[in-house]
Amino acid sequence: MKTYLPIILLMIALPAAAHHGTGISYDLSKLVSAKGVVVKYAWSNPHSQLYFDVKDDQGNVEHWSAEMNAPTNLERAGFTRSQMLNFFKPGAEVTVYGFRSKAGAPVVVFSRAVLTDGREFKSQGGPGQIE
């Protein structure tokens, strides 16, 4: 049994570490931006999500999403659910900055967002970071 315990513990730990391997799923070498319209903000676990629509030069709409911090991390940084829902209101025009999916999907891991009125939300922020 002593031989199997380290193997069992390793098998449990590896999937947890893999889940948090942002660099595995996203190209962290290149920050991209996408300008669009907020469809929905989801205050959810394990990560909050921002859904927004982006039009290309031909007027075709592409549905994007941005993976954000977990609600518990946002709360620790001083953000509330109502603040986030108020900032990311459906219909608001937004420019989202993030690191795109290596698979080429219209998905980014979130870095920051800027609304047309100039207000900005940064993922590493705290109180006062919605400016």
Regions found by a protein language model. Give the residues of each.
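Conserved hydrophobic positions within beta-strands
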Residues: 36-38
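Short aromatic-glycine-enriched beta-strand elements
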Residues: 44-55
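N-terminal signal peptide c-region/cleavage motif recognized by signal peptidases
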Residues: 13-15
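Short boundary/loop segments of OB/S1/cold-shock single-stranded nucleic-acid-binding domains
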Residues: 17-32
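OB-fold/S1-family single-stranded nucleic acid-binding modules
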Residues: 99-126
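Short nucleic-acid-contacting surface segments enriched for D/E, G, S/T with interspersed K/R
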Residues: 77-95
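Positively charged n-region of N-terminal signal peptides that target proteins for export
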Residues: 1-4
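Short, basic/aromatic beta-hairpin or loop at an interaction surface
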Residues: 62-74
